[in-house]
Curated annotation (Swiss-Prot):
NCBIfam families: rplD_bact (TIGR03953). One of the primary rRNA binding proteins, this protein initially binds near the 5'-end of the 23S rRNA. It is important during the early stages of 50S assembly. It makes multiple contacts with different domains of the 23S rRNA in the assembled 50S subunit and ribosome. Pfam families: Ribosomal_L4. Keywords: Ribonucleoprotein, Ribosomal protein, RNA-binding, rRNA-binding. This is Large ribosomal subunit protein uL4. Residues 58-70 have a biased composition (Basic residues). Residues 43-78 are annotated as: Disordered. One of its GO terms (cellular component) is ribosome. Part of the 50S ribosomal subunit. It comes from Polynucleobacter necessarius subsp. necessarius (strain STIR1). Disulfide bonds: none annotated.
Length: 206
């Protein structure tokens, strides 16, 4: 499998050989969907909470007598039927949203995503990606020169300059191969991978 090399001026150069086992697999849409949804679900923190009828502030006094008023019987104002009453099935921070995806499925999903990106021309290789200074302006100008807007950059080792320069750019993310996730791969318009990172990705996903 040959991946195009993207130069600093935005022109595609000679191809770089990559393993077909990782970058030339059939696209499995159902598997990719499952892996991405599971990744999002496992990232949920469970930060919503509602009160049931035991937790709302209320009096236990009976609102009116049981019989003789013509009104529906009522026991206390915390009833879920009443305004200000508790919820019947309240949301809780202890809810578990996690979804199980085994390693074999996860790796297959990642291979499927990378292969599809390569077919669509959204995945390119770069020689190396270093900055002389931790300046966001320098990185933004480099992205503009390469014709990139929304991009995920995967490098063998993230330098301090590159990390500091990229963290204030909304549509630019820089990660190492072991931290590349399925959501980021499908979320960004373009994926740039350094030559050294290609080797690491192949080792991780074989």
């Amino acid at each position: 499998m040959e991946l195009k090399l993207l130069q600093d001026n935005g022109i595609l150069g000679a191809g770089v050989q990559a393993s077909p086992e990782v970058f030339e697999r059939e696209y499995n849409e159902a598997l990719v969907h499952q892996v991405v949804v599971a990744y999002q679900a496992n990232a949920r923190s469970g930060n919503r909470a509602q009160k049931d009828r035991e937790q709302v502030k209320h009096t236990t006094k009976k609102p009116w007598r049981q019989k003789g008023t013509g009104r529906a019987r009522a026991g206390m104002s915390s009833s879920p039927l009443w305004r200000g009453g508790g919820r019947i099935f309240p949301n809780s921070p202890e809810e578990n949203f996690s979804q199980k995806v085994n390693k074999k499925m996860y790796r297959a999903g990642m291979r499927s995503i990378l292969s599809q990106l390569a077919r669509e021309g959204r995945l390119n290789v770069i020689d190396q990606f270093n900055l002389d200074a931790p300046k966001t302006k320098v990185l933004a100008e480099k992205m503009k020169a390469m014709g990139l807007d929304s991009v995920l950059i995967i490098v063998d080792q993230v330098s301090e300059n590159l990390y500091l320069a990229s963290r204030n750019l909304h549509k630019v993310a820089v990660v190492e191969p072991q931290h590349a996730d399925p959501l980021a791969l499908v979320q960004y318009k373009k994926v740039l991978v350094s030559k050294a990172a290609i080797t690491k990705i192949e080792e991780l996903l074989k």
